[in-house]
Curated annotation (Swiss-Prot):
Gene name of the encoded protein: alr
UniProt similarity note: Belongs to the alanine racemase family.
UniProt name for this protein: Alanine racemase
Membrane-spanning ranges: none
Signal peptide per UniProt: none
Length: 365
């Protein structure tokens, strides 16, 4: 049997389903499972297959991601969060029964000129203050009325996106909610306001549809982590590797590139088969926690392309072959991100060269 490099990720699909149920229960309505960017690095097809029996729908960034799911046999509704970029995409949207965000007047006109064999579900997006995609408030009502008059348009959902909902003491979220409420006043249509931060931190903004993304994967995006609602979330991704070498160094010896760490005492140094080419953050600082055979040990030295080093001095039982957890339950991905001045989104989406295993299955994707 061929040996393989030990760096790998384990994806807990039961935890994924648990988190989706929690998000839907929390919002009190329906919930789109956001599986864009390959399900935040977890594997979009396999995650969608795990959720399809109970999901209200999926959300992806673009049509390429939607077609990947359709080609894998996913039949549940799929929303294109960025809408369509070219008029020609409407043929594929209709053919594959996709929903699309409408975020500009030209898209309304394009849809009006398109003859669809069946009605297309539309999510009409208001720019309430994020200032990325979305119609201006003064355009919103006219767009809604135009879409309602078109036979090629099915149900229209009104939506907006919160920019600072991860900051619980910031007034911007309530300001955006007020803009959305004013712009949609009198429109009889389902609404969608809350992303993960909105669901976890802003109960007063719950509406017909939630859009859980990061929380699906067990991470609370709220920066203060002051909400008690993060407790029920279960981490979905656990990233592991092994010690491939152990060295004994005297005091005063530099470790790794640039000598960013110098031993202050006789030190056992473990070498782990995981580096920034795998997706472990290059900017992880000395002291960043790792779990070696279930015991917390600090990162020492600069992370290199294929390896990193850990202080095993206080863990004499650890040796070559010992299991190392880079993130998962402890440390959590949010904790690791904080040590690196990064976001959990970046870490999850940045895994490379790492095999994925799904609990209950032996095959890597």
């Amino acid at each position: 049997m061929c040996s393989v490099r030990p760096a790998h990720a384990v994806i807990d699909l039961d935890a994924l389903r648990h988190n989706y149920r929690f998000a839907r229960r929390l919002g009190g309505g329906k919930a789109l499972a956001v599986v864009k960017a390959d399900a935040y690095g977890h594997g979009a097809v396999r995650c969608a297959q795990a959720l399809e029996a109970e999901v209200d729908g999926f959300a992806v960034a673009c049509i390429e991601e939607a077609l990947e799911l359709r080609q894998a046999g996913i039949q549940a509704p799929i929303l294109l969060l960025e809408g369509f970029f070219e008029v020609e995409e409407l043929e594929l949207i209709a053919k594959h029964n996709l929903w699309t965000v409408i975020a500009s007047s030209w898209q309304v006109r394009a849809l009006a000129a398109f003859h669809s064999p069946s009605p297309i579900g539309v999510w009409l997006k208001l720019d309430s203050g994020m200032h990325r995609l979305g119609l201006e408030p003064k355009e919103f009502r006219d767009a809604w009325m135009s879409l309602h008059s078109l036979p090629q348009v099915g149900e229209v959902v009104l939506m907006t996106h919160l920019a600072r909902a991860d900051e619980l003491d910031n007034p911007r979220t309530n300001e955006q909610a007020s803009v959305f409420a004013h712009a949609s006043q009198g429109m009889v249509a389902p609404a969608s306001v809350c992303n993960s931060s909105g669901l976890l931190g802003w109960a007063g903004l719950y509406s017909d549809w939630g859009r859980p993304g990061l929380m699906l994967y067990g991470v609370n995006p709220i920066s203060q982590e002051s909400t008690s609602l993060s407790g029920p979330l279960r981490p979905v991704m656990m990233v592991y590797s092994k010690l491939i070498a152990v060295r004994e160094l005297p005091a005063g010896e530099p470790v790794g590139y640039g000598a960013s760490f110098v031993t202050e005492r006789p030190t056992r140094v473990g070498v782990v088969a995981m580096g920034y080419a795998d997706g472990y953050p290059y900017f992880a600082v000395n002291g960043t926690p790792l779990l070696v055979d279930g015991r917390v040990c600090p990162l020492i030295g600069r992370v290199s392309m294929d390896m990193l080093t850990v202080d095993l001095t206080d863990h004499p039982q650890a040796d070559v072959g010992s299991q190392v957890q880079l993130w998962g339950v402890q440390p959590g991905v949010a904790e690791l991100a904080a040590h690196c001045n990064l976001s959990a989104y970046q870490l999850l989406c940045g895994l490379k060269r790492v095999r994925r295993y799904y609990l209950g299955e032996m095959g890597a994707v």
